[in-house]
């Protein structure tokens, strides 16, 4: 009888624990101080699996020179400079390098150790630097992704300023009037019924003074959507919670408009919301959402302003259904066979509300795919440049020809240099020295 009693108690405990796990993973807060430990314990296996996968990836990176990753092509007939941050295992530090892709040379570099400027317990390999900008005085501005700090560093490597106060991440884009636009994030709370609510990771945007890092403007993307009667984009779609928590929007780029036209105004912003496969055309001057842009692109990174009526979108083309490693899948057993095999570029014409994909026929032959991160840029006189972060692959397409396909460089140990939110320059005429 005792065994039966213990068994029944065990079943009751399992039922109560299962209900508690379901409650906290759906955003419930009724368990008070127990909410966070129950959630962390429930997600332990997922977190441990992700950590193990990263360790395996790091180990495999150590063994891979990159020489056989893909057929290398370099038919550039003009200079192209790429400013790229990468963790150099041979140097045991993060290095931001300016490469001349045509010549295959490293022309400038900055070795960066964030612990020289801030207190952090994050080991160097995990700090992650992103999206550097080269300025006219040969200083650089860049994001410390996992420390959520923006730095400006002189040509000689001295810290000029650091910006804190927001959790900065992903993209950093300049405005003509000496300002920078950047993605931010914070935890937000939505009250639901009287006794409980939902906490989630909210995306935001911030504008910084490039001369000193002062925050000039800050706004929550959720609040932008709520105020424009678009709450469904925040709360309406039910996807599985990620290990990091509820992240309904996942802003990964903010792109500023530089000219007035019939379809946009100077100072307008295009916001890329990865987890909604949506681009938001937002006007900070009056707080209005001008357009919600959706189409045949999935979990995109990077939206670019092309001209007075065109924008371009880097489409990762990764399914948002299923586990995080669910990509490059064909549903051969279904009547509708939708292929997720190639990342590409979508150009959207605001004038006639149409999309077209200018690079599909070429990219399908290259085998270009990155299931996360990645970016692109149209470079007049050169062509389209595309970065696959997962494969450290730089593809450049001019008309219907691939004029570059390969990695940027090899380090001193023969490993390919990773690409990590690079920036492209067709010339360096803007430098004062």
What does each model-identified segment do?
Residues 1-2:
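Cytosolic-side transmembrane helix boundary signature
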Residues 5-433:
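Histidine-/acidic-rich catalytic cores in large beta-rich domains
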